[in-house]
């Protein structure tokens, strides 16, 4: 079951250490002797790359693997919140709101794998690198006015020039000072590590990690991890195996069912399938026509055709910022509760003047703008065919969604030409820059709505999944939300921005993709997760379940 909760805004060293002690105790009690090195085979979505988290090519899988190899102030929990790691960065505490001030404490005696000391200078170097990027990764870092080292580099004080409530997103997967950026394997292998694991080898589809003997947290963790992009379950029932996948089909579920030594969990993911419209194309710049193109689609039918109604049927999306299953998601769980693996579908309703799918409403809107339905399709009063140019993202999910959407549009008399692009953010850019009318892609959500909302406020960097849409109202909502430190209060403002974007039909959210987590029944303390980092960040707390004696 996926749990919910609010983002942790502060980190107390005592609390983190207490949590770590409790976790270690429970793992140790069920773990084999320390002299026995246990290997975990971990399957994650690939292909892999050698990026740092600040590089544009970084993926959720990249970030998750780096969580095991680099110092972080906060990591992702199973319920999509953030919690302090309590490792090399021992604590991070918000000590003042005016001006916003955060104090980072570095654990003493920490060294990178090349022997160099880890200290506050590494955080300063990371800040200087991050704040200059033309990327949303620079958000927050650009708001830091100064970063001061004290206590022989073991204390770093960040003073902000303006409020930034998402400060717990900063200083994650920090690289050593002077290390090269970029995604090449040569650059990656040249960077030292500092975390619960050290790197042995890395390729496009395989990582090998070994436990860092100097890492004192989680002593019962696996001694070796082999990470691959193969979802094949090991033939040996004694092998320790876990995986995270977005490939949720009848075939994959049946395959898991055939392995009694493997447990599984079907839940929601952090991947939202969506349609976005170009802001200045002749057709899509008109609100009523964006609305018609949105309402004419039967989203539940799209879901049913992709996933069927037996294994898992996601509910029609009710948010452009949140994934279904996140605590702040505005809709109900619908037909996709995170705690069960089989669901029933919910038919779409047809209500005029709402966000619900409504083919009749769409027809009325087209006719209101003098479009005429002919046997060969829709035509304007001047005889121009109603046609759309569509950019489609590269993933299997993108392609499956595009087939369904384009088929429905064609069946409704709308001509469609399709262009496949190399990345999801590039698909968004194609629509934002008015090269196409529509983009169909999958947008990842994170622990905060600010990442999704960046499409509509601030610099339109490529990795913001740019929309090309800017307005004073949306910018004000974004600026207000990101400066509110109370997560409950901030949520209300984020939801207002969310609703405004959907009411203007700049985005037509379709659904949140399901995810499948699998693991050997011999592994204890495994929980379902919304995201790849949410699963991988659990790994250090997993232990081996000892068989119970009978009799």
Describe the predicted segments one by one.
Residues 103-105, 136-183, 200-201:
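Surface-exposed binding/hinge segments that line
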Residues 42-97, 105, 128, 192:
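N-terminal lobe/hinge region of extracytoplasmic solute-binding protein
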Residues 210-213, 231, 267-292, 296, ...:
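A bilobed periplasmic-binding-protein/Venus flytrap-type ligand-binding module shared by bacterial periplasmic
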Residues 211, 297-342, 358-367, 396-407, ...:
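Detector for C-terminal structural segments
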Residues 91-135, 153-157, 283-285:
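Aromatic- and charge-enriched surface segment that lines or borders ligand/interaction sites
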Residues 169-224, 359:
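Gly/Pro-rich hinge or "lid" segments in bacterial periplasmic/extracellular proteins
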Residues 204, 345, 349-355, 369-442:
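Ligand/substrate-recognition segments at binding pockets and active sites
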Residues 205, 212-257, 270, 415-417:
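Ligand-site clamp/hinge motif
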């Amino acid at each position: 079951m996926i749990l919910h909760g609010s983002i942790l805004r502060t980190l107390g060293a005592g609390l983190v250490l207490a949590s770590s002690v409790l976790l270690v105790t429970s793992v140790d009690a069920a773990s084999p002797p320390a002299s026995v090195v246990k290997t975990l085979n971990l399957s994650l979505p690939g292909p892999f790359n050698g990026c740092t988290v600040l590089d544009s090519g970084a993926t959720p899988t990249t970030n998750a693997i780096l969580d095991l190899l680099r110092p972080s102030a906060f990591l992702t929990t199973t319920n999509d919140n953030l919690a302090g790691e309590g490792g090399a960065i021992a604590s991070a505490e918000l000590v003042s709101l005016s001006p916003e001030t955060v104090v980072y404490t570095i654990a003493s005696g920490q060294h990178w794998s090349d022997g160099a000391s880890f200290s506050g200078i590494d955080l300063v170097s990371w800040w200087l690198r991050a704040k200059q990027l033309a990327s949303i990764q620079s958000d927050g870092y650009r708001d830091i006015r100064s970063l001061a080292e004290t206590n022989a580099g073991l204390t770093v004080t960040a003073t902000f020039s303006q409020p930034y409530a998402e400060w717990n997103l900063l200083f994650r997967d920090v690289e050593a000072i002077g290390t090269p950026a970029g995604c090449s394997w040569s650059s990656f292998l040249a960077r030292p590590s500092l975390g619960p694991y050290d790197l042995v080898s890395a390729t496009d589809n395989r990582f090998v990690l070994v436990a860092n003997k100097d890492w004192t947290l989680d002593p019962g963790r696996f001694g070796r991890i082999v990470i691959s992009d193969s979802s094949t379950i090991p033939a040996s029932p004694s092998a320790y195996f876990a995986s995270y996948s977005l490939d949720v089909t009848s075939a994959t579920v049946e395959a898991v069912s055939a392995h009694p030594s493997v447990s599984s969990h079907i839940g929601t993911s952090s991947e939202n399938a969506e349609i976005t419209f170009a802001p200045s194309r002749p057709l899509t710049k008109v609100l009523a026509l964006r609305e018609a193109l949105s309402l004419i689609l039967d989203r539940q039918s799209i879901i049913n055709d992709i996933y069927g109604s037996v294994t898992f049927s996601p509910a029609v999306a009710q948010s452009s910022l949140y994934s279904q299953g996140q605590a702040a998601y505005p809709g109900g769980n619908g037909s996709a509760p995170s705690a069960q693996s089989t669901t029933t579908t919910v038919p779409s309703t047809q209500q005029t003047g709402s966000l619900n799918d409504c083919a009749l409403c769409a027809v009325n809107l087209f006719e209101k703008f003098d479009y005429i339905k002919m046997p060969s399709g829709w035509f304007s009063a001047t005889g121009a065919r109603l046609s759309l140019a569509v950019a489609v993202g590269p993933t299997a999910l993108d392609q499956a969604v595009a087939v369904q959407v384009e088929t429905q549009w064609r069946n409704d008399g709308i001509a469609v030409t399709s262009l496949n692009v190399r990345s999801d953010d590039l698909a968004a850019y194609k629509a934002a820059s008015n090269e196409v009318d529509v983009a169909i892609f999958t947008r990842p959500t994170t622990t905060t709505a600010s990442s999704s909302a960046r499409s509509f406020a601030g610099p339109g960097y490529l990795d913001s999944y740019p929309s090309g849409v800017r307005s004073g109202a949306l910018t004000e909502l974004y600026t207000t939300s990101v400066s509110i430190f109370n997560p409950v209060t901030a949520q209300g403002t984020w939801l207002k921005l969310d609703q405004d974007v959907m009411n203007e039909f700049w985005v037509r959210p379709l659904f949140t993709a399901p995810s499948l987590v699998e693991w050997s029944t011999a592994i204890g303390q495994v929980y379902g997760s919304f995201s790849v980092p949410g699963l991988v960040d659990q790994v250090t707390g997993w232990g081996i379940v000892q068989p119970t004696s009978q009799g």
